[in-house]
C-alpha cells in the first residue's frame, strides 16, 4: 500500500470512541513511586496495576452557598422573563427576543452536575471556530460548566462561587483518586494561573473586601486559607475550612447569625462568600518591608545611546517610547514616579525637578563603582514635571541626532543596571520598581562587560553562566525590581546572559532584529506602552493551597528555582501567568471535592497592599473514562512544555524531541488501552486533548528546538526560550499554531462580524467554518489567495502577484495598477476603506487583540519573491509541514504515532488501573503565608 493510502486510512478515522471501557488484567507486580503528579520525560516506567470498578462522581453540594443574581453583560439586550430575572446568555444585537417560555432561569440545571465539553475537530483552526461558536449564545457558568473554553475563545463568564477560568484553571476537572490512577493517564495534574487576566466584559471588576474592625481577613487558623464561598458556617458559631477540613470558632468581628436556610444572614453583603475571586485589603503586617510605608510603583527608563543604536534609529525610537510611556503614566498611573538615565560608555542622569527652567544633565564616568550624583529630582511624578521631562527628552534626541562626533560604540549595560537598582533602592528604601531598558550591542565596558565573541556552539546549554549577571538578577529579586529589555540589533549579544535578569524577575524581553526606524519604531513604541499599561502591581508573593491529599510539587518559576518554594514576582502584569505542578500526599476519597486556592499577596501600583484570593474545585473520581473526558488541554500542554524547558540540560534537541514523541505515544496508548480498546483499526484521539499532538509537534519545530550543531545560544533561540516564560495561554497557542484566515473565499454577510453589543464574540456561520479553516501547511495556500496570519504578537498579510487586485483595492485602498512589490502599509496598520471586506478584516484583527490582551498588533506584509524575510517567516508559520531537519509533517506524525500505539497495545505495554495499591498517608504540610 502506498504511503498516501496508509495516510488516508490512518487519519480519516480520527474519532473519540467512548462506547467501551477497557478493563485490563491484574498486574503481577507493584512498586512504590515517588509522590509526584507528573513524571519528567527522563523518569522510568510506572508499575502496571490491576482493574477497578468505575463510578462517575458529581461535585458535592457545599452549605452556605447562595446563587448569585442572573448575569447580563454590559449593553446586552437582556429581557424580563416575567419574574424579574434576566437571561444570563448573551443576546445577539440583531436577533429577536425569545419567547417567555425560553427565558427560564439559567440555573435550572443543578450546579452540581458538571457539563462535559462538546466534541470538536482535531484540526486546530476548525476547533477554534467550533469552540467560539459554542459560546455565542451562552455564558460559562463556573458551577455548572467544567472544562473551560479554549484560550483563543472569547466568552462571558458567570462567577458562581468558583473563579473565572481566565484566572485559574485545572488540568483535570475529574481528579484521579490516587497517584496510581493519575499515572495511568500519563498526564500532569496541575494549575495554570493568570491572576489579572482581562475579564469579559472589561468592566467586570473583582470585588475588593475592606479591612474588618480587627484589621485582618477571616482565615483558617490551621492552613491559613482565606474565606471563600466553600467555607461552611454552622449554627454553633463555627466554620469548617474547605481546604484542610478543620473546624474553628468564628471570631466575633466576623460573626453573623445563621438563618433557617443554613446561610449567614449577611451573605449578600459578603462578596468573599459569593465570588470565586476577590481582593482583600490587608494591614501593614502583610507589607513586604514591615517598617517601610508603602509607595506607588517607581519606573527607571534606561536608554542605550551608543553609536550603533543611534545609527539604526533605535535610540530615537526608544526616546519616543519613553515619552509615550510617561504620558500614559501621567494619565492613568498618576501616583507613580519616573526617572530617566541614558548610557553608552558613561552614565547620564537627569534632574527632573518641576521647579527647574531647563533639563539638567549629570555625567558619571566611574563605572566600576557607580553612584548617584544627586537625589532630589531623580524621581518625579510625571504630572508635576511634564515640561522638564519633555525638555529632557528633546535634549537626548538632540544629542542622538546632531552630536554625532561624541557617539561611541561601547555600552556599559551592567553598570547601567546597577545604577538603576541603586536609584530605586535609595529612593524607595528597597521596595522595588520597574526598569525599562534598551540594548543594541554586546556590553563591552564597565561591570558585566562581555568579551567580543560569536555563537560558536562550544557551549551546549542555554543557561546564564556569568557570575555578575546571576548575582545582579538575585539582587533584583531581593529588592522586588523587575527588568524589561528591548534588544534592537541582530548582532550576537549573548542574550542568555544579558537577558538573565529579565528571566529571573518575570520581566519581558522584546527582540527587533535588523531594526529599521521606518518600520519598527511604531512597533517598539506600541510594545512599550502596552507593557506599561499592563502593569497592575508589584512586590508579589504567590501561594497555592490544596485540599488534604494534594500539595504543590513545583512552581514553574525561576524566582523559586522551579521548586515548591513560594515564588516572588517583582512586578505583576495582566499577562503574568504561572504554571503549577501538583503531587499526591495521600489517596483522596472518591465522590468528594478537591478545592484549590491561590493567594497572591501584592501591592497595587498606587501603593495599596492586597491579597487576591482565587478559588476553584474539582471532583474526585476513580473512573478513567471520566477523568479523560474532563481533561483541560491548555494546562496540560503548558506544563508539558515547561517541564521540557526546565530540564533542557545539554540541549540534545534530537533526544528531547524523541522523548516528547514517546510521551505523546504513552498518553494516547493509555487512552486507547483503557477507554477505547475496541477500535483496533482506528487512530483514536481523546476529544479533550484532540489537538495536543499538533501543538506539541509545533513546539518541536520551534526556534528553540532547531538543530544546534552550528549555534546553541543565538539570539533567536534564546528569545524563543524566554518567550515561554512571559506568554499567556492565548499568546502561546497562537505562537505554536498560527491562525490563518482567508479573505478570497466567499463569505456570508454575518461571517467575521461581532455577535454581541460589546464587540467581543466574533461569529462565523457553521456553513463557513470549513472554508475559513486553513491548516498551517503550504499545500493549503492557494496561488492568488489573500490571508491574514496571526502568530501571537504579529499579524501577517499574505498575498502575491496573482491575488485579485479588486480585493486588494477594497482591503488596502491601493490602486489596481500598483505593482505588488510597491504596496506598503502606513505605521503597520490596516487602513480604513469603508468596504465590507476591510471591515471584516478589521474585526478579525480587533478580535485577536482582545484575545491576547494587546491594545494594538503590528500588521506586516508577507509576499513571496518580494519580502526578504518571507522564507524564514513562512517556515515558522507553517507548523504542519515537514521541516528541513526532517521533523515530520502533522499527518505523517499521526501515522507514525498510530503505528507505535498499535505496537504497544499488541505487547500489552501500558499501565492498567487498580485501586488495590495504596500509599502511606502523609499529611499536608502546615503552610503559612
Curated annotation (Swiss-Prot):
GO terms for cellular component: cell periphery; COPII vesicle coat; endoplasmic reticulum; endoplasmic reticulum exit site; endoplasmic reticulum membrane; Golgi membrane; mating projection tip. Present with 12200 molecules/cell in log phase SD medium. Residues 18-28, 40-52 have a biased composition (Polar residues). Residues 18-52 are annotated as: Disordered. Residues 220-244 are annotated as: Zinc finger-like. Keywords: Cytoplasm, Endoplasmic reticulum, ER-Golgi transport, Golgi apparatus, Membrane, Phosphoprotein, Protein transport, Transport. The keyword Membrane applies. The modification Phosphothreonine is found at residues 72, 216. The modification Phosphoserine is found at residues 15, 83, 85, 94, 101, 110. GO terms for molecular function: signal sequence binding; SNARE binding; zinc ion binding. PANTHER family: SEC24-RELATED PROTEIN (PTHR13803), SECRETORY 24CD, ISOFORM C (PTHR13803:SF4). It comes from the Eukaryota. This is SED5-binding protein 3. GO terms for biological process: COPII-coated vesicle cargo loading; intracellular protein transport. COPII is composed of at least five proteins: the SEC23/24 complex, the SEC13/31 complex and SAR1. Binds to SED5. Interacts with GHR1. Component of the COPII coat, that covers ER-derived vesicles involved in transport from the endoplasmic reticulum to the Golgi apparatus. COPII acts in the cytoplasm to promote the transport of secretory, plasma membrane, and vacuolar proteins from the endoplasmic reticulum to the Golgi complex. Residues 29-38 have a biased composition (Basic residues). It is found in: Cytoplasm; Golgi apparatus membrane; Endoplasmic reticulum membrane. InterPro entries: ADF-H/Gelsolin-like_dom_sf, Gelsolin-like_dom, Gelsolin-like_dom_sf, Sec23/24_helical_dom, Sec23/24_helical_dom_sf, Sec23/24_trunk_dom, Sec23_24_beta_S, SEC23_SEC24_subfamily. The keyword RNA-binding does not apply. It comes from Saccharomyces cerevisiae (strain ATCC 204508 / S288c).
